[in-house]
From Swiss-Prot:
Name listed for the protein in its UniProt record: GATA-binding factor 6-B
Protein purpose: Transcriptional activator that binds 5'-GATA-3'-containing motifs within gene promoters. Regulates cardiac-specific transcription during embryogenesis and thereby cardiogenesis.
Keywords in alphabetical order: Activator, DNA-binding, Metal-binding, Nucleus, Repeat, Transcription, Transcription regulation, Zinc, Zinc-finger
Organism (species): Xenopus laevis
Principal location listed in the UniProt entry: nucleus
PANTHER family: TRANSCRIPTION FACTOR GATA FAMILY MEMBER, TRANSCRIPTION FACTOR GATA-6
Alphabetized Gene3D superfamilies for the sequence: Erythroid Transcription Factor GATA-1, subunit A (3.30.50.10)
Cellular localisation: Nucleus
Sequence segments annotated as region (Disordered): 57-107, 277-334
């Protein structure tokens, strides 16, 4: 940069007055402090002032930039001798509205006061510049306006609190669960919301019913069974009773008592009114295990004990043999009864008074009348139940 300035200064004539102290101010009046060492090195390498020894002495003594004290520039844009130091035309003068007619006519030739004036900004003013200002003193927005800016963006920035942006409709439903309603039963409260095939909301009960059965949940609840306390006014349509253990219905749907209902079910005809009883006949239900044990014990006892009452000596002998050798597997037990107890005490054996009567549990034996002892013995041998008695 400085080499270019040196070359151009050596080739062309100077466009400013090389009088001593033209580019310099006193140290007290200069608003910017420039180090002496840097200025001295720059002045020794670049010869801005030529042709007078006074100017050289000034550089060596003051070591400051000198500037013309005249308020007007040495050349302007209308000068017929433009500066040969730069290859571009000088900037046009800028009218800043001040009483002074001087301004920036070149990037190098400026007055001493105007050179540092932009550095000191007034209270209500702005920095001066030879270029077109790109920002106005009063900003209308916090950022420069672009091709896509509009007033909505600026109003958003000027607002103190940010605008809350609402989400999708699904988010609103999630935030407001009370706004949902079951399309089947109309319920608004449920532990879990479900959806049907079309996307409508269902409550948990309707959703599960539809999922398991493939049908919509019925809204009509099934009729509960009326408790017995509410059936006080009922009466049987057949016998007109009001007390029963179980209410039934006939083929016509009328309430009937348990007895009339069972009779109609078993016989197919209405129960006769003559069979009506004042009280309710109930049966005592016993455990099945106890009944079986009692029946088995009674059968065993009856098979071992055989009671016979003989009316003669011969029959008593045979009966004793039967008692001693009686088979326990026999199911029938013969019973011999006597019609004349006095004959047994006297020991008289009249043919008319000797009567043997055999009675079986199943009625296999009927009353048998034997007139003599030989017939009794023959009958005993023929019977199968006393076969071991004569062996």
């Amino acid at each position: 940069m400085y080499q270019t300035l040196t070359i151009t200064a050596a080739q062309g004539p100077l466009g400013y007055d090389p009088s001593p102290g033209t580019f310099m101010h006193s140290a007290a009046s200069s608003p910017v402090y420039v180090p002496t060492s840097r200025v001295g090195s720059m002045l020794t390498s670049i010869s801005y002032l030529q042709g007078t020894g006074a100017s050289q002495g000034t550089h060596s003594v003051n070591s400051h930039w000198s500037q013309a004290t005249s308020e007007s520039s040495s050349y302007s844009s209308s000068s017929p001798h433009p500066s040969s130091r730069y290859h571009y035309s000088p900037s046009p003068p800028m009218a800043n509205g001040s009483t002074r007619d001087t301004g920036y006519s070149s990037s190098l030739a400026v007055s001493g006061r105007d050179q540092y004036a932009p550095l000191a900004r007034p209270l209500n003013g702005s920095y001066g510049s030879p270029y077109t200002p790109y920002m106005t003193p009063q900003l209308t927005s916090a950022w420069p306006a672009g091709p896509f800016d509009n007033t909505m963006l600026h109003s958003l920035q000027s607002r103190g609190a940010p605008i809350s942006v609402r989400g999708a409709p699904g988010d609103v439903l999630d935030e407001l669960p009370e706004s949902r309603e079951c399309v089947n039963c109309g319920s608004v409260q449920t532990p879990l919301w479900r959806r049907d095939g079309t996307g409508h909301y269902l409550c948990n009960a309707c959703g599960l019913y539809s999922k398991m059965n493939g049908l919509s949940r019925p809204l009509i609840k099934p009729q509960k069974r009326v408790p017995s306390s509410r059936r006080i006014g009922l009466a049987c349509a057949n016998c007109h009773t009001t007390t029963t253990t179980l209410w039934r219905r006939n083929t016509e749907g009328e309430p009937v008592c348990n007895a009339c209902g069972l009779y109609m079910k078993l016989h197919g005809v209405p129960r006769p009114l003559a069979m009506k009883k004042e009280g309710i006949q109930t049966r005592k239900r016993k455990p099945k295990n106890l009944n079986k044990s009692k029946s088995s014990s009674s059968n065993g006892n009856s098979s071992h004990h055989i009671t016979m009452t003989p009316t003669s000596t011969t029959s008593s002998t045979n009966s004793d043999d039967c008692i001693k050798n009686g088979s326990p597997s026999q199911n029938t037990a013969p019973v011999v009864t006597s019609s004349l107890m006095s004959a047994q005490q006297t020991g008289s054996a009249s043919p008319d008074s000797n009567i043997l009567k055999y009675t079986g549990q199943d009625g296999l034996y009927s009353a048998v009348s034997l007139s003599s002892a030989s017939e009794v013995a023959a009958s005993v041998r023929q019977d199968s139940w006393c076969a071991l008695a004569l062996a």
